[in-house]
A protein has these predicted regions:
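Glycine-rich phosphate/pyrophosphate-handling loop used in enzymes and phosphotransfer proteins
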Residues: 1-251
Length: 251
């Protein structure tokens, strides 16, 4: 019975077909991808990015003090880490996880992110891991929160965090999907959409905020401001992917 259960879990995490392109080629043994998609994923994971804001950055164009973009528009959070650039098989994994829906892929995305998080010099200082919440109505329709599934995989990379606290942040109202919305409307869309749950003591804590994709950054920026107003010290951001955004502006 235990062997059968283990095999079932293995099939969920490492299906017989590539989770990105659907080819029947067997996964490479580590990720649920064929060899070709695994190579493409490796390129996405190695793309340089700014450690301050998480946006794409060319080689030698960003450092601990940020990149040209976040020097112009300072970020409200203290640093960011990502698994890779939003494209190719990584984009497919994110979309299939969220809309498939395939909750098991949140585990895969979380493991990809955990490898990058373990390299961050600030990771050992995290006190609690907080996934960006869905509004209850969307969570009911989707059946799960992909950010929560990813966050659970990060506990091993951040031993000091102890556990994921999914109750810290509350989404107070449903918000429109951010896709295709200009930056100014994105900021308005999420303004006032989050609060810290009553009775939560964040005084001086270092928080790791987790989400699947960061495009304009308005969602994680709003969550960061809410957490800091409630007393959090440093707030770091971890996302599976960051996407290009044609209309950047203040956070």
């Amino acid at each position: 019975m235990l062997r059968r259960a283990a095999r079932t879990v293995g099939q969920l995490l490492l299906p017989a077909h590539c989770a990105a392109c659907g080819s029947p080629a067997p996964p490479d043994g580590r990720w649920p991808l064929c060899a070709a998609c695994a190579r493409d994923l490796a390129d996405l994971l190695s793309a340089p990015y700014c450690p301050a804001c998480g946006r794409h950055a060319g080689p030698y164009t960003a450092g601990p003090d940020g990149c040209a973009f976040c020097r112009q528009y300072p970020v409200p959070f203290d640093a960011a880490v990502r698994a890779g650039a939003y494209g190719g098989p990584l984009k497919t994994l994110v979309l299939r996880c969220k809309y498939g829906p395939r909750p098991a892929l949140a585990t895969v995305l979380g493991r990809l992110l955990a490898e990058r998080l373990a390299l961050a010099g600030w990771a050992d200082h995290v006190d609690r891991i907080v996934p960006v919440p869905l509004h209850w109505s969307r969570r009911v329709r989707r059946g799960f929160n992909q950010a929560l599934g990813m966050a659970r995989e990060l506990v091993r990379a951040v031993p000091g965090a102890g556990r994921v606290d999914r109750r810290t942040l509350v989404r107070t109202r449903p918000t429109a999907h951010q896709t295709g919305i200009p930056a100014a409307r994105r900021r308005q869309n999420v303004r006032g959409a989050f609060r810290v749950r009553r009775g939560t003591d964040l005084a001086g804590e270092t928080v790791l905020l987790v989400d699947d994709v960061m495009t304009s950054g308005t969602t994680v920026a709003e969550c960061t401001r809410v957490l800091k107003r409630a007393g959090a010290g440093d707030v770091y951001v971890a996302v599976a992917a960051t996407a290009d955004f044609d209309d950047p502006g203040p956070w």
